[in-house]
Amino acid sequence: VLSPDDKKHVKDAWGKVGEHAGQYGAEALERMFLSFPTTKTYFPHFDLSHGSDQVKKHGKKVADALTLAVGHVDDMPQALSKLSDLHAHKLRVDPVNFKLLSHCLLVTLAAHLPAEFTPAVHASLDKFLASVSTVLTSKYR
């Protein structure tokens, strides 16, 4: 459960991401593909090379979903319901992959926002991404 302080940290940090959200989303995906090569199996039709348009577009989708979640932090299950259905029923993404992407997102944010990425903000973002992952995997059951 996100505390009021967690919610403030997440909103403030994501606000700093701003117009770079798509770029950071793509960078996190690239990190995930390089660090955890098995995640590539969900993207057999993608050009996964550095800077590919497909990775950039999907990175923007990831960032847009996170922006939606930040904006609806008190009602993520409703806000992310369609995305949860998609990942559970159509794409059938193994839930562990959300944890891997979350880790890569944290690394990316820490690299780009070192001054803002305090231990408290790190913990809040980690809890937020875990909450998003829980929502996205809730319809697997």
Curated annotation (Swiss-Prot):
Q: What this chain does, per the record?
A: Involved in oxygen transport from the lung to the various peripheral tissues.
Q: Which residues carry this modification: N6-succinyllysine?
A: K7, K11, K16, K40
Origin species, per record, is Theropithecus gelada (Gelada baboon)
**Oligomeric form and interacting partners:** Heterotetramer of two alpha chains and two beta chains.
Which residues participate in O2 binding?
H58
Give the record's family classification: Belongs to the globin family.
Q: Which Gene3D superfamilies match?
A: Globins
Give GO MF terms, alphabetically: haptoglobin binding; heme binding; iron ion binding; organic acid binding; oxygen binding; oxygen carrier activity; peroxidase activity
Chain positions found as Phosphothreonine: T108, T134, T137
Q: Which residues carry this modification: N6-acetyllysine?
A: K16
Where are residues bearing Phosphoserine located in the sequence? S3, S35, S49, S102, S124, S131, S138
Q: Which ranges of the sequence are coiled-coil? A: none
In terms of InterPro entries, this protein maps to: Globin, Globin-like_sf, Globin/Proto, Hemoglobin_a-typ, Hemoglobin_oxygen_transport, Hemoglobin_pi
Give the UniProt tissue specificity note. Answer: Red blood cells.
Give GO cellular component annotations, separated by semicolons. Answer: blood microparticle; haptoglobin-hemoglobin complex; hemoglobin complex
The UniProt annotation places heme b binding at: H87
Q: What is this protein called?
A: Hemoglobin subunit alpha
Q: What Pfam families is this protein classified in?
A: Globin
Task: Provide this UniProt record's keywords sorted from A to Z.
Answer: Acetylation, Heme, Iron, Metal-binding, Oxygen transport, Phosphoprotein, Transport
| Domain Globin residue range list | 1-141
Question: Which residues are recorded as modified (Phosphotyrosine)?
Answer: Y24
Biological processes annotated in GO: hydrogen peroxide catabolic process
